[in-house]
Amino acid sequence: MKQTPDQFSVSHLLSAVESEISAGSEKGDPTERDLKVTLGEKPLWEKFKSLTNEMIVTKSGRRMFPVLKVNVSGLDPNAMYSFLLDFTAADNHRWKYVNGEWVPGGKPEPSVPSCVYIHPDSPNFGAHWMKSPVSFSKVKLTNKLNGGGQQIMLNSLHKYEPRIHIVKVGGPDNQRTLSTHTFAETQFIAVTAYQNEELTALKIKHNPFAKAFLDAKERNDTKSGHDDLTDQQPQFSQLGGWFLPGTGPICPPPNPHQFAPSLGLPSHGCDRYSTLRNHRSAPYPHPYQRSSPPTNYGHDTAASLPMMPTHDNWSGLPVSTHNMLSMSAMPHTTTSTHAQYPNLWSVSNNNLTPTTHAQTHMSGTMGTGLPHQFLRTTAPAPYHSIPTCTVPTTASSSPVYHDSHEVSSTDSGYGHSTTPPAPQTRITSNNWSPMTMPSM
């Protein structure tokens, strides 16, 4: 006779129930005379008891660690049982943590109605409870009244002891309490935060969830420290030039190969201006820095004039013979040196003359290394004394030069002149003529 699909499903379910009952039947006793309940993970509980165990209570509820587990034997495999959990006060003290230890700190608060936690597998056969340890891993401890079915309300800084109740249900005697079991190793003090650092370390060591949380926290702390160090490095590099003088020159040394060899420029750049470089380094780089004088100018190696862009630095400069332009064709010739700054208008002991006189000395002029586009009149003579500078005017001259008076060296602050003023003559544009560079 073949079984119908409905009969096959029913027999499959019944076989599953029979296998479930038989799983814990070997530990069962229909008479319940040898009922035995033992604490699971007893050595771990003993470690926490030696440090005075603490359990966190919060408004939303916090689970216990270590988790309360018991091993049960001696139940009727075919009877139905429920497992309940509640907490009772272990003493009549309120506790406080002083100098690294827990001491009684006064009278306890009035006791609240005891809350009972019912194991979610209840009710169930005795065989179900005996086949594996009964774990109360989902119970939560709270300091708020009426927290819910899975939460137990406890007073902070009070010592409690868990109690496990086994109730037989569904029998002819209806519901009756079979037994209650307590374990001294499971006593703890309810706290809102751990007080003992050794206890905290022990919980982190044995709690896999707390260890994972700690590892994540350590990774975040390590990453945060690494980001701070990375952010500080560019800050230190920017501030280094600000707080430490001389960390960067104002003018770095130029490339010695970027100038023509005929100019004879030294490669030291601005190294000799150490007083300017070490005065104060800017915290931010200047948008434009000139590392060397223009290629069209000669560089006087003996001159000591600072290369400053403002004209105010010219007022206090001493006048010496070795800093001025000299011409080999002039009567008063000294050692030829290059001028550090261009001279657009040549001032000499002679009067201003047309360009024909300048062309006569062109060969001497080109020996100085100055380009021809900056030569306007005669080549300058050595400045033994500053001559009188006169600007000629004519009747048709510009109002700027009309009725102009001669500017003596006395008015300009350079001393007295030994040369009498020359007659005023108008310099016309026809007197200017381009010069060609001689073959080198």
Swiss-Prot record:
Residues 409-440 have a biased composition (Polar residues). It is found in: Nucleus. One of its GO terms (biological process) is positive regulation of DNA-templated transcription. One of its GO terms (molecular function) is DNA-binding transcription factor activity. Residues 282-303, 393-440 are annotated as: Disordered. GO terms for cellular component: nucleus. Its main location: nucleus. The keyword Ribonucleoprotein does not apply. Signal peptide: none annotated. Mesoderm and notochord. Residues 44-215 bind DNA. Keywords: Developmental protein, DNA-binding, Nucleus, Transcription, Transcription regulation. This is T-box transcription factor T homolog 2. It comes from Branchiostoma floridae (Florida lancelet).
